[in-house]
Design a protein with these regions (language model features):
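Long, intrinsically disordered, low-complexity segments
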Residues: 68-69, 144-146, 225-291, 406-416, ...
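Structural register within alpha-helical repeat arrays
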Residues: 96, 103, 177, 184, ...
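Short coil/linker segments at helix-helix boundaries
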Residues: 116-138, 187-201
Length: 565
């Protein structure tokens, strides 16, 4: 068991904060960070602008994941002693495969962040010349990573009886190939580096093996539309949940965390902007600007949410209003306005605030001490469960956990690799290889939509007019940008929505070469009258100037302006 104990620290890669899909931390410092960097989310400060959009990211002399003396050194030490061990040949191959997986997983991040990096595959001493060697070109390093992952796939054994459940196995390696093949293949394609097909083909191959092994999606237990989607991040035990390949287990008194707790407090700083809200389809499968969308408009928050993709309800707290009861401020009753209960009826009623409470995501909400949140939107920055855009992000929120007086009482497991990402990898890689059709859509995107309660994608219906607000990518020396292919845009939309809040955004917009489109748009909130905006110490966005209309502007209503000029 020495080899196991020596390798356990490598599992900390999945909670390493230099990796944007890291499960460590919460709020803007946890998995949301990658999607905040991508412009999908905002911080609820007046000065909470995107560092990449405003070019305020400071360079650092060290760190940011440029590290070969921690994980890489540990892995190389283990690998260097395998041949001298008394293990069987099968055991040696197994542990070499585990080492190759972790070595490759760390290098996947190094390549994404730095491009060309040193290739360190042996134990280095202080006087080793390799310790001060040059960077190796991106292609060579990426080829090495893919080669090692494929070797690991072919040689890892089934040692669950020795390693334990929920440890690195063949399926984890296939999930890494699926992710890396798509990431590197599309980066190479859109950055005109060539030799991208083999990465995309490997992504497809690995994805299809996993799709055969994990044919079922989790549908949840709490009964709301898209419950399986929402409960993937709020479930106590993921060990028996369909589609889970690897997960982070949290246990009371051992390693509890506070991702749900923080979203019940005033310290949760993550909100969604209007542009990202606009990406969510209608339940009929149409973009909101499609001529057949039946969109209800965004001049009223109830209308904005009506008949939308239910995954939106599990990511942003839906609007409502109730009358608070007396005494402990935990009971409530419905208002006389029928519209105020529309989304309470959809999500299920939190009949009386308690700690722990009822179910997963229920309305009305409650804070960390089980005090009632009487209405959403709830604008501001100081009180609990507030935000400035009106779109409060609550992906990790649940009622069933204890969220009282301490940030580290939550024990809901969190996924690391799951089949939903694999389905999206398959769809996108197939398109980039010229092989996406209705059959592929039905095996991938339409499985996700069926669970969410959204109409299926019909490839033949998607033309240049399907979404008048299609995004642009920016080839080299083309500042004007080029509209993304209509079908590819819908594939990417599905990825953005399904993986929202999981940290993939910054990886994706860069490999797609779409960062300017996502980052350079004005960050706005819900539609509001000027009087209501000013009463909340906010102003309106003026589309003619691209800035705030100010306190003395002429606009009577408009979208909330989120940041200082």
């Amino acid at each position: 068991y020495k080899r196991q104990a020596f390798m356990w620290p490598c599992y900390e890669m999945f909670t390493n904060n230099t990796i944007r899909t890291s499960l460590n931390g919460w709020g803007q410092n946890g998995p949301y960070k990658g999607d905040m960097d991508a412009g999908y989310f905002e911080q609820k400060y007046e000065s909470g602008y995107n560092d990449f959009a405003y070019q305020t990211v400071a360079s650092v002399a060290s760190g940011n994941g440029w590290n070969f003396s921690s994980f890489i050194r540990r892995i190389n030490i283990m690998l260097s002693h395998i041949d001298d061990s008394e293990m069987t040949e099968a055991q040696k191959n197994h542990w070499r495969a585990v080492g190759y997986f972790f070595h490759s997983f760390w290098y996947m991040e190094l390549i994404d962040r730095f491009g060309a990096v040193p290739w360190v595959d042996q134990v280095l001493q202080e006087d080793s010349p390799e310790a001060y060697g040059p960077r190796i070109d991106r292609k060579t390093v990426a080829d090495n990573v893919l080669e090692r992952l494929k070797w690991a796939e072919e040689n890892i054994g089934d040692f669950t009886s020795e390693d334990g459940k929920n440890t690195i196995n063949k399926d984890c390696i296939l999930a890494a190939i699926s992710r890396f093949g798509l990431r590197e293949g599309t980066w190479r394609k859109y950055h005109e580096l060539g030799d991208y097909d083999k990465y995309l083909q490997e992504s497809v191959r690995a994805s299809e093996l996993l799709m055969s092994a994990y044919p079922t999606l989790y549908t949840g237990t709490d009964g709301q539309p898209a419950a399986g989607y929402g409960e993937m991040w709020t479930t106590e035990d993921l060990s028996t949940v369909p589609g889970i390949i690897l997960y982070k287990e949290y246990v009371t008194d051992i390693n509890p965390m506070g991702t749900s707790y923080i979203e019940h407090t005033s310290s949760h700083y993550v909100e969604m902007n209007q542009k990202t809200v606009d990406l969510y389809l209608m339940k009929n499968g149409k973009p909101i600007l499609n001529a057949e969308s039946e969109y209800h408009g965004d001049k009223d928050m109830y209308a904005t949410f009506r008949d939308r993709d239910p995954r939106m309800y599990h990511t942003i707290m839906p609007p409502y209003k109730v009358k608070a009861g007396g005494g402990t401020y935990r009971t409530w009753s419905y208002t006389d306005n029928e519209a105020d209960r529309e989304y309470i009826d959809i999500m299920g009623a939190n009949t009386s605030c308690s700690n722990p409470g009822i179910g997963m995501k229920r309305l009305p909400g409650q804070n960390w001490s089980a005090s009632l949140v009487p209405e959403i939107p709830r604008l501001g920055t100081g009180a609990f469960v507030t935000c400035r855009s009106g779109y409060y992000v609550w992906k990790n929120w649940d009622n069933w956990e204890t969220n009282f007086n301490n940030g580290n009482l939550n024990t809901a497991d969190k996924p690391i690799f799951k089949i939903e990402e694999v389905l999206l990898n398959e769809a996108e890689a197939k398109f980039e290889l010229g092989n996406f059709d209705q059959g592929v859509a039905d095996k991938t995107i339409n499985k996700l939509r069926e669970r969410a309660g959204v109409a299926r994608m019909v490839v033949a219906e998607i033309d240049a007019n399907f979404d008048p607000n299609r995004g642009k990518y920016y080839p080299k020396n083309n500042d004007a940008g080029v509209e993304v292919d209509p079908v590819l845009w819908e594939i990417r939309r599905e990825r953005i929505i399904e993986l929202m809040g999981e940290g993939f955004g910054f990886y994706d917009i860069r490999r797609w070469r779409m960062a300017p489109w996502f980052l350079n748009r004005p960050a706005t909130g819900i539609w509001m009258s000027k009087a209501d905006a000013l009463s909340n110490n906010m102003t309106l966005y003026n589309p003619e100037t691209g800035y705030s209309d100010g306190t003395s502007g002429t606009m009577a209503e408009g979208y909330l302006y989120l940041f200082n000029d």
